[in-house]
């Protein structure tokens, strides 16, 4: 398990030297763009708007790759499916999901839309179902 974690870190170092935070204003050209998907990231339309703009910019500026660092219990189903189909799938640059420690529900769907999924030891992914407001 430890080897997988080290392999991912080596992979990121090889392609980017150091992870590049998506919020910075310098060019994404030839950089790995890291998009943290935290606990609340998939529960607001503003977060989806931000991630969609970052993905568009990464494509336009020819980033080397996009890595979604997943730590989410899930979120909005419609916005997630829109992001998968309209923002992630059309990308011509590689996309990776790094699950650390969880990608549940909408997080699992975003991970599935990526080219490859890497998981930290003792991480979990799954339970991608629609839950209504009544439970």
Question: What function would you assign to each model-found segment?
Answer:
Residues 20-135:
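Soluble extramembrane regions of membrane proteins in the secretory/endomembrane system
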Residues 1-5:
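Positively charged n-region of N-terminal signal peptides that target proteins for export
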Residues 7-17:
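Bacterial N-terminal signal peptides
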